[in-house]
Amino acid sequence: VLRYRGIVCDRCGVEVTEKKVRRERMGHIALEVPVAHIWFFRSIPNKIAYLLGIPSKKLDAIIYYERYAVIQPGTVEGLAAGDLLTEEEYLDILDSLPEGNQDLEDDAPEKFIAKIGAEAIYDLLCRVDLDKLSYELRAKASKDSSQQRKKEALKRLQVVESFRASEGYSRPEWMVMKVIPVIPPELHTLVPLDGGRFATSDLNELCRRVIIRNNRLRRLIEQRAPQVILRNEKRMLQEAVDSFFDNSSKAGAVKSDSNRPLKSLTDSLKGKQGRFRQNLLGKRVDYSGRSVIVVGPEPKMHECGLPKYMAAELYKPFVIRKLLERGIVKTVKSARRIVDKKGPEVWDILEHVIKGHPVLLNRAPTLHRLGIQAFQPKLIEGKAIQLHPLACTAFNADFDGDQMAVHLPLSNEAILEAQMLMLASHNILNPANGAPITVPSQDMVLGLYYITKLRKDAKGAGLVFYGREEATIAYNDGKVAIHAPIKVMVDDVDADGNPIRHLVETSVGRLMFNECVPQGVGYINSILGKKALRDIIGHVIKECGIAKTAKFLDDIKDLGYQMAFKGGLSFNLSDVLIPKEKDTLIQEGFAEVDEIMSNYNMGFITNNERYNQIIDTWTHVNTCLSGILMKQLSEDNEGFNSIFMMMDSGARGSKDQINQLSGIRGLMAKPQKSGTEGRTLLENPILSNFKEGLSVLEYFISTHGARKGLSDTALKTAECGYLTRRLVDVSQDVIVTEEDCGTLRGLVTEEIKEGDVVIASLYERILGRVSVHDVIHPNTGEVIVKAGEEINEKAATIIQDSPITNVEIRSVLTCESKKGVCAKCYGRNLSQGHMVHIGEVVGVVAAQSIGEPGTQLTLRTFHTGGIASNIGSEKYVKAKYDGILEIDELRTVDAKDEEGNAYQVVVGRLAEMRVIDENTRMTLITHHIPYGSKLYFKPGDKVKKDDNIFESDPFNAVIIAEETGKLKFEDVVENVTYKVEYDSNVSAGHKEHIIIESKDKNLSPSVSILNSKGDILRTYNLPVGAHFVKSNGDSVKTGDVLVKIPRSTLKGGDITGGLPRVTELFEARNPTNPAIVAEIDGEVSLGRVRRGNREVTITSKLGEERKYLIPLSKQLLIQENDYVRAGMPLSDGAITPADILAIKGPNAVQDYIVNGVQD
């Protein structure tokens, strides 16, 4: 080759040189006319359009040779640079120009210049003065009155600023190309196939079109072809170059013979399969392998079994080095030969090499950081990796053929990091919530549950022993059974953690378990299920630290397996008990359904109600049967029924599954088109169970639900992975950068309640966070936590038990670090149990913690017409402490009950009560007093503990008469605005009048109270679903209930659940039916109805007014004369985050989003 280098073949024009130039020499195509680069006018934001200030549509018209663009108006009146002209207008202007105007130099200011195509764009871009443009846009963005134009100016400014930032490197006019590059030939190869055909890269095809059109255009220009033909050819050249760079971004992509869009330059770079994500970031790496996993019960928690052939290959270079050092071989080549032959000396060296050199195990999909952990390898025979059973939960692994990848950390730093941070025995806590994640499961739990369960009449029950040893001897001797309740002197710790020795009633099995428990934890004397074990492990970590816990876990793992094996727990079909009561319950169910059907046929209930009642009936039958079944199972064989033990311990199986085995299968899902709402359950349930066997029809119905479940899961995984990816993308730069940012701001935290059920207690929400202020006990006045201190378990418990309802804590949302966040604002690192260290990537941890459980969330949006979500609110509100009652915003009317005792009825909607400690003047409890409550105390009264302060109706919202007089109903017409319903107990003849939605939107049902002269004193609007308590013409006293609105109908609409809800919150999307929100505090007055909208006016105490139009289809959440606060919804629907931001400011939005996601 050297001899012929540089010689060019005279036949084919190829130069003789080395092969590698085929990979590095670029070519180019010189274009006859400039061409705009598609990346700069087809991408969003449209860079060229933003710089020139031309709309995208018009820009396309210029680029694709449809319109002329004025570049310099010259002497022509009424034209500006950048205006568009049609062909006719252009020719007219040319004709009207003074003689010789077109012969002037281009820089003469009076010359008229207009061009078409990319040339015009090139000239316009050359004339852009970036600094001047930037100045103008800034002025516009700050001064312009319209929001739309302000936004537009800011978007343009971004593009302008990026060009200004790269001044000297890039000019705007370079977005138009005169030359296009061609990538080296080896990267778009042409391979001859046998048969004389060629397999070619798509790029060649696209490039060919560019060259053909370019050459044709050159020929036409030389031949002086007419403008029309030239313009068409130029347009085609522009299109060819567009598809060469990006063939997917526009309609009408170039197709190949097989009608597949050709893959352009951009397509091969972008997306998951593109060059970056597939080949640069997603490379396969050396020093790695993968194999099937099997369970490894022998290794310790930080070890895994590695097949020796795999290890020999992974550690090959290390082994070769040792072979050379020991002088067994002289050259690397011979060393490699020995390693390949796997000679006996290789295994010795391998044992030596792997000491202290951990491997990383990874199971796909890696949803959170515990999906990759480090283990110390042990060489094993066979070809499968042995995984420690306790590590399975973190990897979400099981042994039904899962595979795992092994990677080898090479550098000393990597090895150190793997040993210190990633070793499996250090990762016992889940970083998402601080709960132990290495919890024994399945067999281990079953074994431990079995030996800690007591059996009253077992052999040796009631014996007393002076110590553990004696009891063990008796057990080994067969004098006492493992389950027998016996009394033993044991070592324990008291409440303050001091060691004591006392007599407890326990069993031999529990003594065995306590042998594994580290000292200082105390004697654990209870039956062990999965939940109990999780709590114990958490407790052991707190008391003894991670190292001791790892040993404890290994010990209980061995004990659990051993005992599950010794217990010989299995079950057979006769363990599946079918309750005798099953038939009678089913008969009762059928009887009820018949009654419901006859009610429906007689027209007492609507079809929807019939459906709901039938579903309720069968659900009730199912629950009853399930309860009986569980009771029977738990009593069978003194609680030693294998199925019951497996379920009760949490090892395997759920109540649901056992119910299907021996109760009834229950209601099944209905085959549905996706996206249609309506009834999701078939109303005739499957009444057989798996023990009895299903009929063909029942089997067929079952298969539908099963298949739907599987397909949902598959869809869910992809959706959830994408959510995680977006979360990591936005949060990866949030890192703990300093110890303390010194902010004085924080978030006020209180417990989250749904109705009256506490979802997250105050203890959970403040544990491990840092308090902003001193937290003072309201009763004693002592400081529980100083400002800037971490709230630990002890302090959190004191706060939880005291009357304190909210604590202001430091939060990442209010942190004032310049970059990242500070340790004080973040609080405790949940995976370690102490304050977070500098450098922790808390953003990614947070993203993973939300993304990882995403697969368990549901995918669908539930369409439920108000499910009466059993609102278990109390009727009475009691004082929890003695103190003085204070009430804000109270409006009441006086009323008397049947016995004539006076009480007060609250008619304000914003009454808030507080009970205050007499001495420290600190608030002990706060509570909202709902409208219509009966109040038993006056503000300023002293209340005692457990006094009833007020009573309210938890099941109905009410409308209260605020005046005395006669009732008059307006627009209340039977079967138009109200219907009559009969109670299910028809014989009693109890009728109810219920307001319905009328077709006539102008009717608005209301009730007025008139005085003796017939003047209207008060008018109340009647919402849909309201039940009358009084009738027309009745006389009422103040405080009487006029109308009841059942609360179950108040909860309605779409309950967006699961994954879509989380996505919706993070993107702060505006919901489909937003609620209308009050912007100011004030009194409500309802205006008249016009065009199907009701006018609502809010007047503040200062006289400020705001008007809102609320569609009649929406339910009003307020009544005439209510007092509302800013940010309260006036109609049903979801509150838009944007509204909260506008009305209550950024902190409220943060609260709303955080609480929403945590739900």
Curated annotation (Swiss-Prot):
Q: Cofactor: bound how, per the entry note?
A: Binds 1 Mg(2+) ion per subunit.
Q: Name one Pfam family in it.
A: RNA_pol_Rpb1_5
Instruction: Name the residues that bind Zn(2+).
Output: C741, C815, C822, C825
User: Sorted alphabetically, which SMART domains does this protein's record hold?
Assistant: RPOLA_N
- SUPFAM superfamilies hit by this protein: beta and beta-prime subunits of DNA dependent RNA-polymerase (SSF64484)
Report keywords, A-Z: DNA-directed RNA polymerase, Magnesium, Metal-binding, Nucleotidyltransferase, Transcription, Transferase, Zinc
Q: Where does this protein have coiled-coil stretches? A: none
Highest taxon of the source?
Bacteria
- Please give the GO cellular component terms listed in this UniProt entry: DNA-directed RNA polymerase complex
Q: Which EC numbers characterise this protein's activity in its record?
A: 2.7.7.6
Q: What InterPro entries does this protein's entry cite?
A: DNA-dir_RpoC_beta_prime, DNA-dir_RpoC_beta_prime_bact, RNA_pol_asu, RNA_pol_N, RNA_pol_Rpb1_1, RNA_pol_Rpb1_3, RNA_pol_Rpb1_3_sf, RNA_pol_Rpb1_4
Tell me its family: Belongs to the RNA polymerase beta' chain family.
Summarize subunit and interaction data from the UniProt record for this chain: The RNAP catalytic core consists of 2 alpha, 1 beta, 1 beta' and 1 omega subunit. When a sigma factor is associated with the core the holoenzyme is formed, which can initiate transcription.
NCBIfam families xrefs: rpoC_TIGR
Name of this chain's protein: DNA-directed RNA polymerase subunit beta'
Q: Which organism is it from?
A: Porphyromonas cangingivalis
